[in-house]
Amino acid sequence: MADITINGLTFEPYIEREKIAEQIQRVATEISRDCKTSNPLFLCVLNGAFMFAADLIRHVNLPMAEITFIRFKSYEGTTSTGVVKEIMGLNEDISGREIIIIEDIVDTGTTAVQLRALLEEHNPASVKMATLLFKPESLKQGTAPEYVGFNIPSRFILGYGLDLDGAARNLPDIYVLKENA
């Protein structure tokens, strides 16, 4: 893997696709074990989590599992705005359902807290979160997700669903913004 330049910023390789696949399998196994007696509804947060959600749901060993999608936005460029905008809301009845939110990354926790609060208004049986990436040093509110692929430092990353102003979501590996770039 070589460095790449997106919108004038240089990114270096960070997590290769093989390691991503290994962690997704581990997370799917944990979810399958924890939810073996239930019929969870997976809630994919678009746009960033679409690749993680697709790969995760294929490895979850729960034949009755369902998936749906919502969309929130909290980033402009490389920075979290601190304001979460709901772009596409929830359309399913989740009352009494076990919900597993699928996120690409949990950074400050702002989106996660607002999303959990929104879901709790609909009386689900439980709400858990699975994220591919978690920045524990950046967490300002809420709690750590129940299922985490990788704990990472507080640096800007892209690839494998994560973007910079819409670009680079399609990359199969994850890249980190080069320091002093």
PLM regions and their residue ranges:
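PRPP-associated nucleotide enzymes
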Residues: 1-181
